Amino acid sequence: MGEEVQIGATAVGIKAKDGVVLAAEKRVSYGFYTLSSAGRKVFVIDDKLAIASAGIIADMQSLARIVKINAKAYELETRKKPTVRSMAKLLSVIMFSRRYMPFFAEVLVGGVDEEGSHLIVMDPLGSLIEDNYAALGTGAKLAISVLDTGYREDITLQDAKKLAVKALKAAIERDPVSGGGIDLVLIDQTGAKEEEVKVQLLI
């Protein structure tokens, strides 16, 4: 029997009172071999919507393209932006339709619409749960303990950013297949802002 090959990634999402933060580390690994330290796992869909993912990079990119194309088509047809929940439901249907040959990716959908801020968590089969914060991937157990301790319902977007970085640093320090720095997307009523945080660990 062959050994299980672990495909590493850690992503977190936090809903703030004035927006949403999505973040993920940048390492792309296959087992304990690092393929790249510049992998992007957070994808801006439009100026009010983004997704973050943990799993196989190709599947993450495919799902991001599907959401982006459908969001743009909806906007062109209706002349208004889709809600966060409607795009999450679309993605859920697509993922469930592939349940016999699933996408190997867990997904966080985050954004802001007329109903406020939303963070939606999805497993590879498309199960859909709205939550205040979440962590996915191989470092999720390490990251979620930081989020459990630091989250509060009145958290601001900037404090949520700091908490997301802290959670991912905790995962990077202990999870051998996570690392390479951190990509973030901060979304509020003014739009989506992408940021990068470099991480240097003492070995």
Swiss-Prot record:
Q: Name one GO molecular function term.
A: threonine-type endopeptidase activity
A Gene Ontology biological process noted in the UniProt record is: proteasomal protein catabolic process
Q: Which terms in the GO cellular component ontology are assigned? A: cytoplasm; proteasome core complex, beta-subunit complex
Q: Which Pfam families match?
A: Proteasome (PF00227)
Q: Please summarize the record's notes on activators and inhibitors of this protein.
A: The formation of the proteasomal ATPase PAN-20S proteasome complex, via the docking of the C-termini of PAN into the intersubunit pockets in the alpha-rings, triggers opening of the gate for substrate entry. Interconversion between the open-gate and close-gate conformations leads to a dynamic regulation of the 20S proteasome proteolysis activity.
Q: Does the keyword Nucleotide-binding apply?
A: no
Active site residues per record: 10 (nucleophile)
Key words of the record: Autocatalytic cleavage, Cytoplasm, Hydrolase, Protease, Proteasome, Threonine protease, Zymogen
- What does the UniProt function comment say about this protein? Component of the proteasome core, a large protease complex with broad specificity involved in protein degradation.
- Check the record and name the PANTHER family matching this protein: ATP-DEPENDENT PROTEASE SUBUNIT HSLV, METALLOPROTEASE TLDD
Q: What family is reported?
A: Belongs to the peptidase T1B family.
Name the chain's protein.
Answer: Proteasome subunit beta 2
Species assigned in the record = Pyrobaculum arsenaticum (strain DSM 13514 / JCM 11321 / PZ6)
Provide the gene name from the record: psmB2
